Amino acid sequence: MAKIYRETDADLSELKGKVIAVLGYGIQGRSWALNMRDSGLRVIVGVRPGKSRDLAKEEGFETYDVAEATKMADVVAVLLPDMVQPKVWTSEIGPNLKPGALVIFAHGFNIRYNLIKPPSNIDVTLVAPKAPGKAVRDEYLRGWGVPALVAVHQDYTGKALRRALAVAKANGFTRVGVIETTFAEETETDLIGEQTVLVGGLMELIKKGFETMIELGYQPEVAYFEVLNEAKLIMDLIWERGVYGMLNGVSETARYGGLTVGPYVLDNSVKERMRKAAERVRNGEFAREWLNEYEGGMKNLSRMLNEVKNHRLEVVGEDLRRLMRSGR
């Protein structure tokens, strides 16, 4: 059974008098910085000159270059894009960390695949909200929060978990619940979920359904509504009620058809391919492939994005979305 930490398991006094540097001021970084400041903590922002730094200044933060912010900080939240982190770590973060500093990542990718190798005299932890950055801020302001994961990779001070939980509490995560995990589990499940279900799986399922209906002679606009537009309604039901609750929220015809035809379309061969995709994540093959793609200028990614952009599903969808917005 998973260990879940809540409000009474975390103490903000662990961070009293400490300087917290949020590195990066994108959607996630901004939300963390604002939340922790509103929780009474001293927060500075490390970010390069540009629009993000200007925004941080406008919102009342002391801003510094990443290296300078790291030097000043007792707690360093690394909220830069994953693929930017290793280079910035080598040149600006790693050489400037105080002994005993707490470093927090929001995703375990670079630690899991040894792209960042931290020194032995710091604490290294993970605090990973399971929601987009905007929701992290919005739910905090609502007096609630979003669920998160916490993990300890390195505990130099003996206080790594306590301090990470304090950061989680300052962001509102312990109001909902913070699940203890490992860097490996967080990273692998995140990638496997994205590839096989959330991004890759859903996208391809919708595309294949759309293509099938078009090939059978149905109107593209009608097919779009059936396979994409209504997918949100079903996912909302699943999110609110679970899969069983969703089934009780649709018609008996939909319920029977889904339960009998769904396993035929997505049979155990799909699960076998999911396992193969998962193994590529677990053995590092996907990480190596993605790193090569990134360092090579992401030409394959650009090509694939253009293919999606020009797919008939997107062309039809753009027109229909414009039509639906026109009445607002």
Swiss-Prot record:
Binds 2 magnesium ions per subunit. Pfam families: KARI_C, KARI_N. SUPFAM superfamilies: 6-phosphogluconate dehydrogenase C-terminal domain-like, NAD(P)-binding Rossmann-fold domains. Coiled coil: none annotated. It is an enzyme of class 1 (oxidoreductase). Its cofactor is Mg(2+). Pathway: Amino-acid biosynthesis; L-isoleucine biosynthesis; L-isoleucine from 2-oxobutanoate: step 2/4; Amino-acid biosynthesis; L-valine biosynthesis; L-valine from pyruvate: step 2/4. It catalyses: (2R)-2,3-dihydroxy-3-methylbutanoate + NADP(+) = (2S)-2-acetolactate + NADPH + H(+); (2R,3R)-2,3-dihydroxy-3-methylpentanoate + NADP(+) = (S)-2-ethyl-2-hydroxy-3-oxobutanoate + NADPH + H(+). It comes from the Archaea. Belongs to the ketol-acid reductoisomerase family. This is Ketol-acid reductoisomerase (NADP(+)). The gene is ilvC.
